[in-house]
Amino acid sequence: MIKQRTLKRIVQATGVGLHTGKKVTLTLRPAPANTGVIYRRTDLNPPVDFPADAKSVRDTMLCTCLVNEHDVRISTVEHLNAALAGLGIDNIIVEVDAPEIPIMDGSAAPFVYLLLDAGIDELNCAKKFVRIKETVRVEDGDKWAEFKPYNGFSLDFTIDFNHPAIDASTQRYTLNFSADAFMRQISRARTFGFMRDIEYLQSRGLCLGGSFDCAIVVDDYRVLNEDGLRFEDEFVRHKMLDAIGDLFMCGHNIIGAFTAYKSGHALNNKLLQAVLAKQEAWEYVTFEDDAKLPMAFRAPSMVLA
């Protein structure tokens, strides 16, 4: 039987909030089977929980937020959510003493390291996957995203940025997903932004944690970071990282083929909601026979060590 996963122990880290620029303490806690992914703000009294749920997602100019019925929100969840998807973590309590998850280096890699440091535990309960049964597509002008049936999890993402630093040959990336492929090829790709936008936002008291330490920063001509890029196609890899996190907002790994053109958080979420709203387009599946599990979700020994 393919089992649900949680953490072996509690781990903690500190970072800076992208919005406030203030120190944030992040605590990751194991959770029992069928808990799901829960984000918790401990800076509020009493603490407020935000279960990962496609319908709770709000896209802002700077990040993805989860918002509850009282309009209380927790921000910048997308990169940690991608790390949870990448390692197939089904049950976890994510606590922060702030309104946002720390931005860390702008990628998912610090969260992957933290999760691996905690250790991954298998629970004696079947893991539920969402399997795509019919093609579902959403569009917004010339942007689009779709899911098709596929016995695995594949991603094909194209961006279209007219910028000298983003070469035409590096605007498309495809991935046959696995935990190992995610860690090696996707998790280290950082978010990116224009220097002029960061300066403008900071002049208005926003994006106070934005810096070269947590993003690729470009001007009109080049990448400004001294160390340059981690991958020549880091921009599109990061957009794929975002999509992996966005699509895991249903709390389950998805079995299907995802293709997107110029998509972002809002359109990724629109696709996920469109799939879930169409009952005949998907189903929950479990795997009693390990041999029937798609290769995409077979954990390498380093993950479950």
Swiss-Prot record:
Name of the gene: lpxC
Protein name: UDP-3-O-acyl-N-acetylglucosamine deacetylase
Required cofactor(s): Zn(2+)
Catalytic reactions on record: a UDP-3-O-[(3R)-3-hydroxyacyl]-N-acetyl-alpha-D-glucosamine + H2O = a UDP-3-O-[(3R)-3-hydroxyacyl]-alpha-D-glucosamine + acetate
Similarity comment: Belongs to the LpxC family.
Molecular function (Gene Ontology), one example: metal ion binding
Keyword field: Hydrolase, Lipid A biosynthesis, Lipid biosynthesis, Lipid metabolism, Metal-binding, Zinc
Pathway: Glycolipid biosynthesis; lipid IV(A) biosynthesis; lipid IV(A) from (3R)-3-hydroxytetradecanoyl-[acyl-carrier-protein] and UDP-N-acetyl-alpha-D-glucosamine: step 2/6
GO CC entries: membrane
Pfam families: LpxC
